[in-house]
């Protein structure tokens, strides 16, 4: 499969990959390694503002690249972060995700929503 230049750049560099630790860190995940796609986000939140984001992902290059992009572009008030920094359709176009892989973007979105929900519940 041929990947877009943007997908390859984020896949190879994987900026913000890893975990965050501390009392002000919130974690959410979605998907299943057994099914081929799993994503986890960690958010460090201070005063209701996202200070840092990290991700772990298991899946195809599109999954890893989009997760990296989302973590890199996370920021702002956590109350406004219940949706991805960009919509699933926009991310699909930005990263040239083929139709048969777009379900993976929904897993990324579910992981993001789970993480923000965890932050809002504390």
Language model features with spans:
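Domain-level signature for proteins that mediate thiol-based redox and metal-cofactor handling
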Residues: 1-122
């Amino acid at each position: 499969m041929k990947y877009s230049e943007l997908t390859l750049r984020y896949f190879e560099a994987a900026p913000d990959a890893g975990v965050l630790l501390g009392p002000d860190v919130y974690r959410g995940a979605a998907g299943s390694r057994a099914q081929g796609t799993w994503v986890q986000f960690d958010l460090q939140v201070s005063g209701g503002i996202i200070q840092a984001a990290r991700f772990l992902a298991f899946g195809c290059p599109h999954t890893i690249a989009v997760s990296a992009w989302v973590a890199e572009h996370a920021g702002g008030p956590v109350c406004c972060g219940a949706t991805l920094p960009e919509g699933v359709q926009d991310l699909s176009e930005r990263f040239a995700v083929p139709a048969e892989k777009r379900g993976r973007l929904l897993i990324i979105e579910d992981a993001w929503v789970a993480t923000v929900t965890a932050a809002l519940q504390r």
